[in-house]
Amino acid sequence: MITITEHYTPMFRRGYRMQFEKTQDCHVILYPEGMAKLNDSATFILQLVDGERTIANIIDELNERFPEAGGVNDDVKDFFAQAHAQKWITFREPA
C-alpha cells in the first residue's frame, strides 16, 4: 500500500465520481465497473476532494469541523490509502 503524505493533492481518477444516489439514500462512488456505497465519514472526506486541496488542508478542515473527534489525521491518511488501493483516487505530488 502507498505511503500517504499530507502534501499530496488527492483527485478522483478519470471516470470516477461521487454523487448522492436517491435509490441508495447515500453518497456513492460511480465508476465504469459499478458503484460503491459510502458511509458518512467517507462522504465528508471525499466532498473536500477538489484537485486543489492537499491532504493537510482536508485534515485541517475536518479537524475544525469535528473537534470532538480528537484529531482525524491518521484516519484520513488511512482512508486515502484505501481509496487509492480501490483506484478511486490518484495523487498529485507537490512540485
Curated annotation (Swiss-Prot):
InterPro entries per the UniProt record, alphabetical: PQQD (IPR008792), PqqD_bac (IPR022479), PqqD_sf (IPR041881)
GO biological process: pyrroloquinoline quinone biosynthetic process
Superkingdom as given in the UniProt entry: Bacteria
Molecular functions per Gene Ontology: quinone binding
Pathway: Cofactor biosynthesis; pyrroloquinoline quinone biosynthesis
Matches recorded under NCBIfam families: PQQ_PqqD, PRK02079.1
Family named by the database record: Belongs to the PqqD family.
Function text: Functions as a PqqA binding protein and presents PqqA to PqqE, in the pyrroloquinoline quinone (PQQ) biosynthetic pathway.
Quaternary structure note: Monomer. Interacts with PqqE.
Protein name: PqqA binding protein
Organism: Rahnella aquatilis
